[in-house]
C-alpha cells in the first residue's frame, strides 16, 4: 500500500512563484532608475560632461560606482551621499567644487576610491573623511588647499595612495599622517613647502615612495625621515636646497633612489650618504657643487647610476678625488660631467681635463687612497678639526663635517706641462741609449761561443769564395799559356825546379817551350 503526497499548489502557481523570485533577484542588476544624460552599465553610472550643477537625485541607491567628472558642481552638501552606501568608487574631478561641508561623505563605508582632483577646494573640515574607513585611494591634487587640519586623515588606516600635488600647502602639521599606517605612496609635489617638521611623517611605516619635488625647501636634514623605515624612493628635485645634513647616526637601509636634481646644493655633510648603504641611484644634476670630498664618494659603494652634470666643477687639483672615483665607477652616469672653471678648461670633460692638463700627478683609481689635504705655492689648506680649517695664517670655522668649498686660485699649468714634457723626452732618449749599450755588453759577455762560430763561418765563407776565384783565374790562364800538359812526379813540385821532373811540351806557333 503506497502513500501518495499531493502538493497543495498546482503547476501554474509554482511557475508564477519561480518567475517572481527570478525577477526579484534581477532587480538590483537591472537598475531601478538610470539618471537622464547618464550612461549606465549594470550598477556603474557614468555621468561625465553632462553639465550637472549638483549630484543627480534619480541615481540608483544600490550603485557601486558613480562618475561625475567634468561637470559644474560647486559644492558638496552634508550627507550628500548618505544613501549611496554601496558605492566603492566616486569620481568628482574636474568640477568647480570649492566648498565641502562636514560629513559630506557620511555613510560611504564601502568606498575605496575618491577622486576630488582639479577643483577649487581651499579648505577641508577635519571630519571630511572620518567615516571612509575602507578608503584606499584619495586624490586631492590640483586644488587650492593652503593648510590641512592635523586630524584630517584620522581613521584612514587602509589608505594606500594619497595625492596632494599642486596645491598651496606651506607646512605639514605634526602627526598629520599618524593614522595612515598602510600608506605606500604620498605625493606632496608642487606646493609651497619651505621646511619639514621632525615628526611630519610619523606613522608612515609602509611608505615606499615620497614626492617633495617643486617646492621651496632650502635645507634638508635626513633625520626628519627617520620614521620612514620602508621608503624606497625619495624625490627632492627642483627645490632651493643648498645644504644636506644628517643630524644623527642611523642606517636608512631601504632607500635605493634619491633625486636632488635642480637645487642649489653647495655643501654636503660628510656622513650623509653613510646612512644610505643600499643607495643605487643618486641624481644631483644642475646644482652648485664645485668639488666632492673623497669621504663622501667612498661611502657611495652600492651606486649603479649617478647624475652630476650641470654643476660648477672646478677642474683643478681639487677635482682629483671626483676624477679618481669616476675612473673606477662601474655603473653609468647621466649626461657628461663638464668643467666650469677655470676658463681654459671650461666645457671639457672632467676626465679629459685631468689627463690632458695633468691636474693630478698621483691620480689613483682608489678613492680612499687620495690625500685629504691640498697644498700649493700660494695657499695652504690643512684640515685641523671637524669644526675649523686653516687658510694660510687664518682659521676659518665651519659646520662640523661639512665639506669646505672656499674659493682659491691655482697657477696656470702651461709652463709646468712644457717642462715636464722636455724632462720626459730627455729621460726617454737616455734610457734608450743605455739600453742598447747594455744589450751589446750582455751579448759579448754571455754568448762568446756563438760570436766565434759566426766569425769562423764568415772566414770559411770568405776562403771558399777566394779559392773559387783563384781556380777560375788559373783555368783562364791555362787556356792561353804555353803549356798544354804537365805531368809532375811523386816527389813534389820542387823536383821540377831541380831538374828531376818531366815536362812534355808542345811548341806552339807563336811561343817557345822551355824546360
Curated annotation (Swiss-Prot):
Keyword rRNA-binding applies = no
Q: Which PROSITE patterns match?
A: LRR
**What is the recorded phenotype of mutating residue 181 to A?**
Reduced heparan sulfate binding and reduced induction of presynaptic differentiation
Q: Which residues lie on this side of the membrane: Extracellular?
A: 34-421
Signal peptide range equals 1-33
Cytoplasmic side residue ranges read: 443-515
Motif Involved in DLG4-binding is found at: 512-515
KW Glycoprotein (keyword) present: yes
One GO process term, biological-process aspect: long-term synaptic potentiation
Entry domain remark: Synaptogenic effects are mediated by the extracellular LRR region.
Family, similarity comment = Belongs to the LRRTM family.
Q: What is this protein called?
A: Leucine-rich repeat transmembrane neuronal protein 2
Q: Give the species this sequence originates from.
A: Rattus norvegicus (Rat)
Amino acid at each position: 500500500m503506497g502513500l501518495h503526497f499531493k502538493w497543495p499548489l498546482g503547476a501554474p502557481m509554482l511557475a508564477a512563484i519561480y518567475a517572481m523570485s527570478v525577477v526579484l533577484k534581477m532587480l538590483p542588476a537591472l537598475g531601478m532608475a538610470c539618471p537622464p544624460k547618464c550612461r549606465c552599465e549594470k550598477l556603474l553610472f557614468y555621468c561625465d560632461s553632462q553639465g550637472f550643477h549638483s549630484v543627480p537625485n534619480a541615481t540608483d541607491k544600490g550603485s557601486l560606482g558613480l562618475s561625475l567628472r567634468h561637470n559644474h558642481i560647486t559644492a558638496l552638501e552634508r550627507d550628500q551621499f548618505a544613501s549611496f552606501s554601496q558605492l566603492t568608487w566616486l569620481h568628482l574631478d574636474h568640477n568647480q567644487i570649492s566648498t565641502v561641508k562636514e560629513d559630506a561623505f557620511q555613510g560611504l563605508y564601502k568606498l575605496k576610491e575618491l577622486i576630488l582632483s582639479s577643483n577649487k577646494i581651499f579648505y577641508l573640515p577635519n571630519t571630511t573623511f572620518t567615516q571612509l574607513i575602507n578608503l584606499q585611494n584619495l586624490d586631492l591634487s590640483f586644488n587650492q588647499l593652503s593648510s590641512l587640519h592635523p586630524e584630517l586623515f584620522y581613521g584612514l588606516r587602509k589608505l594606500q595612495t594619497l595625492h596632494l600635488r599642486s596645491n598651496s600647502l606651506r607646512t605639514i602639521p605634526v602627526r598629520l599622517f599618524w593614522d595612515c599606517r598602510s600608506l605606500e605612496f604620498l605625493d606632496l609635489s608642487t606646493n609651497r613647502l619651505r621646511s619639514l617638521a621632525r615628526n611630519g611623517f610619523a606613522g608612515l611605516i609602509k611608505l615606499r615612495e615620497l614626492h617633495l619635488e617643486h617646492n621651496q625647501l632650502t635645507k634638508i636634514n635626513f633625520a626628519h625621515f627617520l620614521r620612514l623605515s620602508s621608503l624606497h624612493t625619495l624625490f627632492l628635485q627642483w627645490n632651493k636646497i643648498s645644504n644636506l645634513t644628517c643630524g644623527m647616526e642611523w642606517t636608512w637601509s631601504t632607500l635605493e633612489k634619491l633625486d636632488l636634481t635642480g637645487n642649489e646644493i653647495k655643501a654636503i655633510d660628510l656622513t650623509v650618504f653613510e646612512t644610505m648603504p643600499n643607495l643605487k641611484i643618486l641624481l644631483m644634476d644642475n646644482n652648485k657643487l664645485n668639488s666632492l670630498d673623497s669621504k663622501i664618494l667612498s661611502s657611495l659603494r652600492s651606486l649603479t647610476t649617478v647624475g652630476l652634470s650641470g654643476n660648477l666643477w672646478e677642474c683643478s687639483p681639487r677635482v682629483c678625488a671626483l676624477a679618481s672615483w669616476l675612473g673606477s665607477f662601474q655603473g653609468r652616469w647621466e649626461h657628461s660631467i663638464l668643467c666650469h672653471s677655470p676658463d681654459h678648461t671650461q666645457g671639457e670633460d672632467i676626465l679629459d681635463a685631468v689627463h690632458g692638463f695633468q691636474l693630478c700627478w698621483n691620480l689613483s683609481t682608489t678613492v680612499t687612497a687620495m690625500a685629504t689635504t691640498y697644498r700649493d705655492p700660494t695657499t695652504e689648506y690643512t684640515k685641523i678639526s671637524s669644526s675649523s680649517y686653516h687658510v694660510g695664517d687664518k682659521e676659518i670655522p665651519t659646520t662640523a663635517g661639512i665639506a669646505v668649498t672656499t674659493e682659491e686660485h691655482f697657477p696656470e699649468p702651461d709652463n709646468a706641462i712644457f717642462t715636464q714634457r722636455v724632462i720626459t723626452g730627455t729621460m726617454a732618449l737616455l734610457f734608450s741609449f743605455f739600453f742598447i749599450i747594455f744589450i751589446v755588453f750582455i751579448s759579448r759577455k754571455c754568448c762568446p761561443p756563438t760570436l766565434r762560430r759566426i766569425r769562423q763561418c764568415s772566414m770559411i765563407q770568405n776562403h771558399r769564395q777566394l779559392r773559387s776565384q783563384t781556380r777560375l783565374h788559373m783555368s783562364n790562364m791555362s787556356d792561353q799559356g804555353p803549356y798544354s800538359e804537365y805531368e809532375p812526379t811523386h816527389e813534389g813540385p820542387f823536383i821540377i825546379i831541380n831538374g828531376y821532373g818531366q815536362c812534355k811540351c808542345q811548341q806552339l806557333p807563336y811561343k817557345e817551350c822551355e824546360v
